């Protein structure tokens, strides 16, 4: 890619991407535009501006994407009750398509002919960033330094930074032994002692949540109001999507909710252990299934459950911008038209317990479902014919001697 003139770099301001910035300038003799996204990671993003300026960057983008992230990516994903491999709520995966989108938008605005990212050659993020970029701008060039250079250790990165006078923080604060990634939906931890699948994670690793043992001894009750499958209010107070998730993170974290320790199957072929804190997302998943339980038709709910693993894999593997994900999303969104109402939850020492749900669009009919006298709302004698018709094929097979014993 010797003809690269301008590159948009996904820039955090940390050691890795600061080294990448200088490496791009030296290796490709190109202009670098930096893009730093505020996705609610809880860290100040403005210092990235000063670091980029110190490295000679003229065009610097620092964007607050929290509302767009939750409104256009997190909420649509939760309408599907999305879980990867039964447990993972896709906190990292769902952030990547937005970053890819913004990288391409900035490339178009600035006339850049390439984008670059700091994802390693071992992980899923390289796939997610690049699939998104190619889907949105087929001819874009992508530079992935971790697949090109020989700076394959933190020590080598530090040496490069010192040699090239790259500004890096040196202070007495203890650095986390884990590789961490955070946004408004979750915080992830990988590496360190977690690479031994038998070793228990350390309690002081967790940043957002109290341990269930240290959580309050009295439960916290909350009410979530839904409109078309999305939460619009907590305890009757209207909130924006980002405000909803931030508040649920706070409440959930106080009650020890949302910790996860899993070994997942990466798209690139390896197994990887990760620990995740997703307090707000854990609450949202439980509550959304509760409001759907009274507002969705049975077959619609079951079909959604059958399609969800495919939808989850598409997001995990980086296919958010694919036509098949878009097709599934349209179906999912159509199912949410009547998913309105209120869910009441009890949060207690790591548990999310549904204690009530109500909706003007509820399909629950107490007159039919009652165990008491129903006044003729349901004729129990009808069940006999229903059962016989559904047993017909099995009765015929049994009559031919095709029994199971």
Curated annotation (Swiss-Prot):
What enzyme category does the UniProt record give? Answer: ligase
Q: Which reaction does it catalyse?
A: L-citrulline + L-aspartate + ATP = 2-(N(omega)-L-arginino)succinate + AMP + diphosphate + H(+)
What InterPro entries does the record point to? Arginosuc_syn_C, Arginosuc_syn_N, Arginosuc_synth, Arginosuc_synth_CS, Arginosuc_synth_type_1_subfam, AS_cat/multimer_dom_body, Rossmann-like_a/b/a_fold
Sites where the protein binds L-aspartate: 120, 124-125
Top-level taxon of origin: Bacteria
Q: Looking at the UniProt record for this protein, which Gene Ontology cellular component terms does it annotate, in alphabetical order?
A: cytoplasm
UniProt: ATP binding residues: 10-18, 37, 118
The regions listed as transmembrane in this protein's record are none
Involved pathway(s): Amino-acid biosynthesis; L-arginine biosynthesis; L-arginine from L-ornithine and carbamoyl phosphate: step 2/3
Location of this chain's protein in the cell: Cytoplasm
Task: Cite a single GO MF annotation.
Answer: argininosuccinate synthase activity
Give UniProt keywords alphabetically.
Amino-acid biosynthesis, Arginine biosynthesis, ATP-binding, Cytoplasm, Ligase, Nucleotide-binding
GO terms, biological process: argininosuccinate metabolic process; L-arginine biosynthetic process; urea cycle
Enzyme Commission code: 6.3.4.5
Coarse class of the primary localization is cytoplasm
Which positions bind L-citrulline? 88, 93, 124, 128, 179, 188, 264, 276
What quaternary structure, including any partners, is listed in this protein's UniProt entry?
Answer: Homotetramer.
Please report which protein family the annotation says this sequence is part of.
Belongs to the argininosuccinate synthase family. Type 1 subfamily.
* Full protein name: Argininosuccinate synthase
Species this protein is from: Stutzerimonas stutzeri (strain A1501) (Pseudomonas stutzeri)
């Amino acid at each position: 890619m010797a003809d690269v003139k301008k590159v948009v770099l996904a820039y955090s301001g940390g050691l890795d991407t600061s080294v990448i910035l200088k490496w791009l300038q030296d290796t490709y003799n190109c202009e670098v535009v930096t893009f730093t996204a505020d996705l609610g990671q809880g860290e100040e993003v403005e210092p990235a501006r000063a670091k980029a300026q110190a490295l000679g960057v003229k065009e610097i983008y620092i964007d607050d994407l929290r509302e767009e992230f939750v409104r256009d990516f997190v909420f649509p994903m939760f309408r599907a009750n999305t879980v990867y491999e039964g447990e993972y709520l896709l906190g990292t995966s769902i952030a990547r398509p937005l970053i890819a989108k913004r990288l391409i938008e900035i490339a178009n605005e600035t006339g850049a002919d390439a984008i670059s990212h700091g994802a390693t050659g071992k992980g899923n993020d390289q796939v997610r960033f690049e699939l998104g970029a190619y889907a949105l701008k087929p001819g874009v060039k992508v530079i992935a330094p971790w697949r090109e250079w020989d700076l394959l250790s933190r020590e080598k990165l530090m040496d490069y930074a010192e040699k090239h006078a790259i500004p890096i923080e040196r202070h007495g604060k203890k650095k986390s032994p884990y590789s961490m990634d955070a946004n408004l939906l979750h915080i992830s931890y990988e590496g360190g002692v977690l690479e031994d699948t038998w070793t228990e994670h350390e309690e002081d690793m967790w940043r957002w949540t109290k341990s269930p043992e240290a959580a309050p001894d009295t439960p916290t009750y909350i009410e979530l109001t839904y409109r078309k499958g999305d939460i619009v209010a907590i305890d009757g107070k209207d909130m924006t999507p980002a405000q909803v998730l931030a508040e649920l993170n706070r409440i959930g974290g106080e009650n020890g909710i949302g910790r996860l320790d899993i070994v997942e199957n990466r798209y690139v072929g390896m197994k990887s252990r990760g620990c995740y804190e997703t307090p707000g997302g854990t609450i949202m998943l439980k509550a959304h299934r509760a409001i759907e339980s009274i507002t969705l038709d049975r077959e619609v709910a079951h079909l959604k459950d059958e399609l969800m693993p495919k939808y989850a894999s598409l997001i995990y593997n980086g296919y958010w911008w694919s036509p098949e994900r878009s097709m599934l999303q349209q179906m999912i969104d159509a199912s949410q038209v009547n998913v309105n109402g209120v869910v009441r939850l009890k949060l207690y020492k790591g548990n999310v317990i549904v204690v009530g749900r109500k909706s003007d669009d509820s399909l629950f009919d107490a007159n039919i479902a009652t165990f008491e006298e129903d006044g003729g709302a349901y004729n129990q004698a009808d069940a006999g014919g229903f059962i016989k018709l559904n047993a017909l094929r099995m009765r015929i097979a049994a009559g031919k001697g095709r029994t199971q014993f």
